[in-house]
Amino acid sequence: SITISASQALHEVVLDDHPRLLLFLPLAHCFARFIQYASIASDDGVVGYLPDTKTLLPDLRSFEPTYLLGVPRVFEKVYNAASRKAGMGWKGRLFLKAAESARDWSRMQQAGEKPTMKQTAEHLSYEASVYHTVRGALGPRIRYVACGGAPLDVSLAHFFNGIGLPMIQGYGMTETAAPFAAT
């Protein structure tokens, strides 16, 4: 039943062409197990396993996952690394403006609002200069990110949504064998 639940809850992810998951969370983590089963339930899903995260970024680029599961700290590190790489000068200011624009874009989408032409142009500009680089660090085929294990800061979820990586959040208890909800 957990496999059926996983494929139903995450149907958009597992119906993606050739879904690929690179898993580094322990399988004792119920959402990791759940999302792994969603991949396996797909006709052509592939799951890769990492024993630790020491080589995570090169492994992401070589494995080319279509979605990634992590705990909030992983996504905080991705954001902080991108911010740090941008630096303190004009690139740093550009990154901060792009990050705020991504969060605003996500909030507008969530509220069902239409962006203005100026907002659309700004978003496309940041796509070309910032967003594709952040996504590229997670692998060239990444389409979704999933988070479980602890509450994720809302602004961080909006950042990933706004750069074109829908954030799936899982909630549940290991004792129940599966997440209670995935949004």
Model-derived features: where do they sit?
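Conserved AMP-binding/adenylation subdomain of ANL enzymes
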Residues: 3-23, 27-131, 141
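Active-site loops of AMP-binding adenylate-forming
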Residues: 152, 161-165, 173-183
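Phosphate- and divalent-cation-binding pockets in alpha/beta enzyme and binding domains
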Residues: 77, 97, 155-156, 177-178
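Residue-level signal for inorganic ion chemistry
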Residues: 68, 149, 160
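Alpha-helix/helix-capping structural signal
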Residues: 73, 150-151
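Active-site glycine-centered loops adjacent to acidic/histidine catalytic or metal-binding residues
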Residues: 26, 149, 172
